[in-house]
């Protein structure tokens, strides 16, 4: 028989807990369970549901140990994405525990959950105030736990309520509490800057603390605050400088150097005082971190001027030593400082060319990527080829790292290949083009070599995904053709090789636009233009619409220069090429791109006229091909013009492009006149034709067949038309059916077979008449150099000068541009790790104001607003009264005045005094009413 007073299962658990017997799953059991159920997502999800159900039951338990265990497990589960905001009140209960271990768990959970719920922080404020008071009940560790937890859940309202308690803790006798309070104040200042303004002296006094850890915490907090707003800390420069001179703690010295870096950016006067001390510190210390921060302070703090070579050499010599270090991190950050010094003045780093070239072959690709940014500062005529050769080898050769393993006696080596990422290859191509073309190719003394480099880059860029490199390579070919006249034959030979390469057409089509433009613009250099035309038209399937736009005019230019190099035996070839071009442009005239379609139709009509004239003219070339066609393109030779020149041209401010020349009525009237003139001309032509028939044809004397056989030359109108046809080359004469049919037919079979043969050789017109055919498949440009003989420098044309116009309007030709390079707005789907702060734009103009004074000023502002509202009400009443007086006697106006709520006597007295001291209210209200 069971007793009524037998203990239950819960009572037994409670009795066994003091002896170490726990029946709930601990955090360790939870982790083991997750690992054991991690086979499939379904099993893991089922396990999580079971654990969450158990935690919900445990967290509602009256036993604080069980509640703490559940909160700890929920804190761990939050990392898997399970929200724990529903148990915030239970977390608050655990935080209020007097046991140290339970309080730690509570503050840990609060740091992960309370920031989502601002209401729970109102309940936690009193608990935080209680835990922050150091007395006999609270030991040092509990206060430290509260300070650490406070910094993670701080909000503006909580910071305002807790700031005074934290400043009180700065006077604690325990250095540990003072240090923790200073670090907690950092988050308070970010959310509530008024606390720093009102208690600035109390906070700064900790820089003179007896304990070095407290001073270190104060310097660190000031350093971090100066990143947000350095202005209020400039007045501390003498005190901070004194600490820098006297202290021997390297950590504090580093923090002070970082702090002076931020301050000197807004206060240039600090340079004269700080620079000698920092240079002295660099010479006296052996600590690598201090030396690096000293150089960083000089560079980032704007202390290094463009003409200060002595300071620059002192910094660069130290960085040179770091670059020889075995530590890759030290080499990397040294390259960063090298680059920043080079941006100030490139002459500073010009003497370190050998070091930078060596860094270009570093085993760490990230160091290579930083070293390649330094190349532009060291390049000259002497080392350009060495730099380009070093970079080009990295495209082809596979670098390896030899890793030594094993003991000294039996030493083994392992070869690890260095994988070059694609972004580094893209960077190399851009740098090679940039350093070679800089300052109008001033560093290039061998343009045959540079032609070969550009050709190799075009071949290497086929496997790179960034196809914009092809456009840059094409621009280099174009610049060489325009700016280096003596190398045009070599350059155009390389261009012909490129467009004849099917791999280039398929994998790097972006290089074709500029290359095809060069072939058209400088087609006088090509002797057999008919073969070049066949090459260009055969690859039409690879050309994009932008390339087709350039191709149309390029083909016409090549044809014009080739056919005008006229020989008697070329007449048939000219006719065949002309037919091929007409057929080619007929296909392009149906393009989906309007620009291609328009250009094709324009050229097609002209070539059809030229073909008609060529068939009619049996002696030589017709005037359309010999004079008219070359005049389209040979008026003048193009000169090099710098990019952006168009924006410098003068813009007429009086130019109106909006107002039409004719009004709508005038335009309609003009159109009506044109229609009437056209109708009258048509009627006159019809009447004249009837008169001619009556005059020259007699039905009684002539039969129908004889009428048809009348000689046209007896008709005076036909004679006039024939004269006009002979004198006007643009006259569209009638064609018989056979001629029209032949002009629209394709080429004969034999001609097609001959045209399908790909030309093997493109011959160039050389000035010395010593022409050697260039085989596209086998021949290469010879680059023989005589030893011991310096090659004469070729002439490079400079850009044409442009007279700069007066300052234009800001909105004139202003292109839309993106600001994402400077300001990258955070996407909504990304985690924002940036700490929210109100310190950046806070005004620290009034230092030392107490919080009471701030509240008083706030009350005065409220009273001032109430006075303004009262005056506005009086003004409205007077306006209504004036309107009522102006109304007639028959009209009735009812004004309902609401009863005003009772105000403080202080506000009433203030209103009376203000009314006494102010000018007459009637005049003020009268002025206000007139404004209204």
Swiss-Prot record:
Annotated region described as Disordered, given as residue ranges: 720-868, 897-932
Location in the cell: Golgi apparatus; Cytoplasmic vesicle, Clathrin-coated vesicle membrane
UniProt biased composition (Basic residues): 783-793, 897-915
Modified residues (Phosphoserine): 700, 727, 770, 773, 798, 888, 918
KW Thylakoid (keyword) present: no
Residue positions, PTM N-acetylthreonine: 2
Coiled-coil region: 858-878
Composition bias type Basic and acidic residues, residue spans: 738-747, 755-766, 806-832, 857-868, 923-932
Alphabetic keyword roster: Acetylation, Coiled coil, Cytoplasmic vesicle, Golgi apparatus, Membrane, Phosphoprotein, Protein transport, Repeat, Transport
Biased composition (Low complexity): 767-779
Bias (Polar residues) ranges: 838-855
Pfam families according to UniProt: Adaptin_N
Function: Part of the AP-3 complex, an adaptor-related complex which is not clathrin-associated. The complex is associated with the Golgi region as well as more peripheral structures. It facilitates the budding of vesicles from the Golgi membrane and may be directly involved in trafficking to the vacuole. Required for the transport via the ALP pathway, which directs the transport of the cargo proteins PHO8 and VAM3 to the vacuole.
PANTHER family, per database record: AP-3 COMPLEX SUBUNIT DELTA-1, DELTA ADAPTIN-RELATED
Protein name per the record: AP-3 complex subunit delta
Record organism: Saccharomyces cerevisiae (strain ATCC 204508 / S288c) (Baker's yeast)
């Amino acid at each position: 028989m069971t007793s009524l007073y037998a203990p239950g299962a819960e009572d037994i658990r409670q009795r066994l807990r003091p002896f170490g017997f726990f029946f709930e799953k601990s955090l360790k059991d939870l982790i083991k369970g997750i690992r054991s159920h991690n086979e499939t997502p379904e099993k893991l999800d089922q396990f999580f549901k079971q654990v969450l159900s158990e935690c919900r039951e445990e967290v509602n338990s009256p036993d604080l140990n069980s509640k703490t265990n559940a909160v700890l497990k929920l804190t761990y589960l939050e990392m898997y994405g399970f929200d724990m905001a529903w148990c915030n009140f239970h977390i608050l209960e655990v935080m209020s525990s007097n046991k140290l271990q339970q309080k730690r768990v509570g503050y840990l959970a609060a740091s992960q959950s309370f920031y989502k719920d601002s209401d729970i922080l109102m309940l936690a404020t009193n608990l935080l105030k209680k835990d922050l008071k150091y007395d006999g009940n609270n030991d040092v560790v509990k206060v430290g736990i509260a300070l650490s937890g406070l910094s993670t859940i701080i909000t503006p309202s909580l910071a305002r309520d807790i700031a005074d308690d934290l400043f009180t803790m700065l006077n604690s006798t325990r250095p540990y509490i003072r240090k923790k309070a200073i670090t907690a104040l950092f988050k308070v200042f970010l959310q509530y800057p008024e606390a720093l303004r009102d208690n600035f002296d109390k906070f700064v006094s900790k820089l003179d603390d007896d304990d070095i850890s407290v001073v270190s915490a104060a310097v660190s907090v000031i350093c971090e605050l100066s990143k947000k707003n350095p202005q209020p800390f400039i007045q501390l420069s003498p005190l901070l400088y004194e600490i820098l001179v006297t202290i021997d703690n390297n950590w504090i010295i580093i923090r002070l150097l970082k702090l002076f870096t931020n301050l000197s950016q807004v206060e240039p006067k600090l340079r004269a005082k700080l620079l000698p001390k920092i240079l002295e510190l660099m010479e006296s210390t052996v600590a690598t971190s201090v030396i690096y921060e000293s150089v960083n302070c000089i560079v980032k703090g704007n202390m290094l001027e463009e003409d200060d070579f002595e300071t620059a050499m002192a910094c660069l010599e130290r960085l040179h030593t770091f670059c020889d270090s075995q530590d890759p991190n030290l080499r990397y950050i040294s390259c960063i400082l090298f680059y920043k010094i080079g941006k100030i003045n490139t002459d500073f780093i010009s003497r370190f060319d050998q070091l930078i070239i060596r860094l270009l072959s570093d085993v760490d690709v990230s160091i290579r990527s930083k070293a390649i940014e330094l190349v532009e500062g060291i390049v000259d005529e002497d080392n350009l080829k060495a730099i380009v050769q070093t970079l080009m080898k990295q495209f082809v050769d596979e670098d390896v790292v030899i890793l030594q393993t094993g003991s000294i006696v039996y030493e083994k080596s392992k070869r690890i290949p260095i994988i070059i990422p694609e972004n580094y290859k893209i960077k190399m191509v851009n740098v090679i083009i940039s350093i070679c073309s800089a300052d109008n190719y001033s560093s290039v003394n061998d343009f045959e070599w540079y032609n070969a480099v550009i050709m190799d880059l075009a071949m290497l860029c086929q496997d790179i995904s960034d196809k914009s490199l092809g456009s840059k390579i094409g621009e280099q070919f174009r610049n060489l053709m325009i700016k280096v006249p003596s190398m045009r034959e070599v350059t155009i030979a390389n261009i012909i090789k490129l467009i004849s390469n099917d791999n280039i057409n398929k994998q790097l089509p972006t290089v074709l636009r500029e290359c095809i433009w060069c072939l058209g613009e400088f087609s006088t250099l090509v002797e057999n233009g008919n073969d070049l035309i066949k090459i260009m038209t055969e690859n039409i399937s690879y050309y994009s619409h932008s390339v087709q736009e350039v191709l149309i005019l390029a083909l016409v230019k090549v044809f014009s220069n080739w056919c005008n190099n006229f020989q008697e035996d070329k007449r048939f070839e000219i006719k065949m090429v002309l037919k091929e071009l007409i057929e080619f442009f007929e296909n392009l005239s149906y393009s989906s791109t309007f620009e291609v379609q328009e250009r094709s139709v324009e050229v097609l009509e002209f070539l059809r006229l030229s073909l008609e004239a060529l068939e009619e003219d049996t002696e030589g070339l017709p005037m359309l091909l010999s004079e008219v066609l070359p005049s389209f393109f040979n008026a003048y030779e193009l000169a090099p013009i710098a990019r952006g020149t168009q924006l410098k041209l003068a813009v007429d401010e009086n130019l109106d492009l909006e107002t039409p020349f004719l009004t709508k009525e005038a335009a309609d009237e003009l159109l009506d006149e044109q229609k009437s003139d056209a109708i009258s001309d048509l009627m006159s032509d019809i009447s004249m034709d009837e008169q001619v028939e009556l005059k020259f044809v007699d039905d009684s004397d002539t039969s129908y067949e004889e009428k048809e056989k009348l000689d046209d030359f007896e008709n005076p109108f036909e004679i006039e038309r024939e004269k006009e046809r002979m004198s006007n080359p643009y006259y569209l004469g009638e064609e018989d059916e056979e001629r029209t049919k032949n002009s629209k037919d394709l080429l004969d079979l034999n001609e097609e077979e001959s045209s399908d043969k790909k030309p093997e050789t493109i011959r160039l017109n050389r000035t010395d008449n010593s022409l050697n055919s260039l085989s596209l498949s086998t021949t290469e440009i010879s680059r023989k150099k005589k030893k011991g003989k310096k090659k004469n420098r070729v002439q490079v044309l400079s850009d044409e000068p442009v007279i700069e116009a007066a300052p234009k309007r800001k909105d004139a030709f202003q292109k839309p541009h993106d600001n994402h390079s400077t300001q990258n707005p955070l996407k909504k789907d990304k985690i924002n790790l940036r700490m929210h702060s109100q310190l950046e734009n806070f005004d620290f103009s009034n230092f030392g104001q107490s919080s009471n004074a701030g509240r008083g000023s706030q009350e005065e502002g409220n009273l001032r607003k109430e006075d303004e509202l009262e005056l506005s009400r009086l003004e409205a009443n007077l306006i209504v009264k004036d309107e009522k007086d102006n109304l007639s006697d028959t009209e009735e106006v009812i004004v309902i005045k609401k009863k005003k709520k009772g105000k403080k006597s202080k506000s009433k007295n203030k209103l009376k005094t203000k009314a006494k001291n102010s000018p007459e209210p009637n005049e003020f209200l009268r002025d206000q009413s007139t404004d209204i």
